[in-house]
Curated annotation (Swiss-Prot):
Subcellular localization, as worded in the UniProt entry: Mitochondrion inner membrane
Record organism: Saccharomyces bayanus (Yeast)
Protein name per its UniProtKB record: Protein PET54
Principal location class: mitochondrion
GO molecular function: RNA binding
């Protein structure tokens, strides 16, 4: 009995002095990772083994953070506007860095991995608009994501200035940083919010309207810049970027022209005879407008 009590006493004294149980080995910093990086949270390991982003695929481009928060169990019986969210995250609508088109997916960026795991567990069997929610951890390293979002931010900023800056900037390199944290990524995303609210993408804009005379044609909107980002003359398809001086004009432009026939934009028919005359001359495709802030 005395021998066992001495052994127990020895274990307790060792645990009190070192904080480790007898027989354990101190963890060592892997080769290639500095002690400073390990003490600061080991970002390099975190980016690979502990993702901070959930990927959510959806064809609905109009989801907002409130939709994602609504499926938490605590909000099941609450009205919209009364939802609570103890697992804070930022909802990111993923867009193509070059043409700014919505890529049918959202990212949920969390502050820490534990919050990500908890949210995924709580919403595993949930539905949004009657569609089963399927979210998967994004294993892509944070610096790679940062590079993509920086590319998008830079291209949007250039497009907001002029077509010349946009096309020249497409070939510029983006410097990838090794050590990236969540707050840096948030800053990049926040930097484009205002520009997104003042920008629209327009498919099937009438080719008869050139960038030089669009400002005069739409004189009642305060347009900042307008140019074709993509065009296919054979298929009669084009994608135009238009930026405005204020977000209200961008919103009104989409509301007034989305779904309108191109021929009606150029020459609004007043009589049935006018309609018949324009059908054979002007493209009858519809304008599809996307407000980048939606």
């Amino acid at each position: 009995m005395k021998g066992s009590s001495k052994a127990i006493k020895r274990v307790l004294e060792h645990l009190q002095s070192t904080g480790r149980v007898l027989g354990t080995v101190e963890s060592k910093v892997p080769a290639g990772i500095s002690e400073e990086a390990a003490l600061s949270g080991g970002h390099q390991q975190l980016q690979i083994k502990k993702p901070l982003i959930l990927q959510f695929r959806s064809y609905n481009p109009y989801l907002v953070k409130e939709d994602i928060v609504s499926i938490l169990p605590e909000n099941q019986y609450k009205k919209r506007g009364q939802f609570t969210n103890g697992l804070d995250f930022q909802l990111i609508k993923v867009r193509d860095p070059k043409y700014f088109q919505f890529k049918d997916q959202y990212y949920l960026l969390f502050n820490d991995h534990n919050s990500l795991v908890e949210y995924a567990d709580l919403t595993r069997l949930s539905r949004i608009n009657k569609v089963r929610v399927r979210m998967t951890p994004l294993m892509q390293p944070l610096p790679n994501l940062m590079t993509k979002f920086q590319r998008y931010s830079q291209n949007l900023h250039n497009a907001f200035q002029s077509s010349e800056k946009y096309f020249e900037g497409l070939t510029e390199k983006i410097d990838a940083k090794n050590m990236i944290d969540v707050t840096q990524l948030w800053r990049v995303l926040d930097s484009v919010r205002e520009m997104e609210s003042k920008s629209v993408l327009v498919w099937n804009f009438p080719t008869e309207l050139q960038s030089s005379n669009i400002l005069n044609y739409f004189w009642f909107y305060n347009i900042r810049s307008s140019f074709k980002m993509y065009w296919d003359d054979e298929m009669k398809r084009n994608l135009r970027f238009i930026s405005f001086e204020n977000s209200n004009d961008a919103y009104r432009f989409k509301r007034n022209y989305h779904g309108l026939l191109a021929k009606e934009l150029l020459n609004p028919p007043r009589k049935e005879k006018d309609t018949l005359e324009t059908n054979s001359v002007i493209d009858d495709s519809k304008l599809l407008i996307e407000h980048l802030n939606e």
